[in-house]
Regions:
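Active-site-proximal N-terminal segment of extracellular/periplasmic enzymes that hydrolyze or transfer
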Residues: 38, 211-219
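Intrinsically disordered, low-complexity polar regions and short flexible loop motifs
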Residues: 206
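Alpha-helical packing segments of well-folded alpha/beta enzyme cores
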Residues: 3-7, 129, 220, 224-228
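Beta-strand elements within well-structured catalytic alpha/beta cores of enzymes
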Residues: 4-7, 20-29, 103-106, 129-134, ...
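Generic beta-strand/beta-sheet core signal
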Residues: 23-26, 34, 91, 107, ...
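C-terminal cap/loop subdomain of S1 sulfatases and analogous C-terminal strand-loop tails that border
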Residues: 69-100, 112-122, 126-203, 220, ...
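Short, glycine/acidic-rich hinge or "gate" loops at secondary-structure transitions
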Residues: 15-23, 144-151
Length: 236
């Protein structure tokens, strides 16, 4: 956060703030991870190192200890992480919308054609920054790099949305993270955990993913699963 503030101050001082495209977003929903021996313990190596050094790490939410220092690990656990993402379902490390759907704030007074402070519910993805920046810069995606042929990018430009237009996006977005998988295509999303069955949600009517339509619309599930298998194979 300090670095962002430093950058913004420099843009203001050099009078480049109005015509600089700034997009600010985070990578996932609220974090459920605990620093403990139970549940998700991705940071347990920190505990081992501290114990070996004869130090104690303050874990969780300690009212009498300022959290954020090198010997603290603030965490809220699964239940509160889910609550923090209300009304979305689940949390970080999961590809339900509570873990994978986050807001993006855009600042570009000289270029945006939308009303200041307005909210667009149109879909975008971090991969779309490639096509967006290429279009804004008037640049061409390279066909080769260091003597090797580059692979085509899978990015869709967000510029039409920045210009205030409504874009019909039928592009399939593929998610695979920490044993959870999803495909988002058009108004629909399939999602599963591990090797469990695929659930189907109609995001246009059920963005909170509470009504599983897999049994009512098996053909759509099959169609979307084929996208997954084409990308990852049947065993993944």
């Amino acid at each position: 956060d300090q670095a962002v503030g430093t950058l913004l101050e420099a843009l203001k001082k050099t009078k480049r703030m109005e015509n600089t495209f700034i997009i600010y977003f985070h990578d996932n929903g609220a974090c459920p991870e605990h620093l403990s021996g139970n549940g998700w313990n991705t940071a347990n190596n920190i505990l081992a190192k501290a114990e070996k050094a004869g130090k104690t790490i303050a874990v969780g939410d300690k009212y009498d200890i300022p959290m954020g220092g090198p010997m603290t690990y603030g965490s809220v656990g699964h239940n509160w992480a889910n609550a923090q993402n209300t009304p979305m379902r689940r949390y970080k490390s999961n590809v339900h919308n509570g873990g994978a759907c986050t807001p993006a704030i855009v600042h570009w007074p000289a270029g945006l054609k939308t009303k200041p402070g307005s909210i667009s519910k149109q879909r975008g993805h971090v991969v779309d920054l490639m096509a967006t920046c290429l279009e804004l810069a008037g640049a061409k995606y390279p066909e080769e790099f260091k003597g090797g042929e580059t692979k085509p990018h899978e990015s869709l430009s967000l510029v039409p949305i920045l210009k205030g237009k409504t874009v019909d996006r039928d592009h399939a977005y593929v998610f695979n993270h920490s044993g959870t998988h999803a495909i988002v295509k058009g108004e629909y999303k399939i999602v599963r955990e591990g090797r469990g069955p695929w659930a189907l949600y109609h995001l246009a009517k059920d963005r909170t993913e509470t009504k599983n339509l897999a049994k009512q619309d098996p053909e759509r599930v099959t169609e979307m699963v084929s996208i997954w298998e084409k990308r990852w194979g049947k065993k993944k």
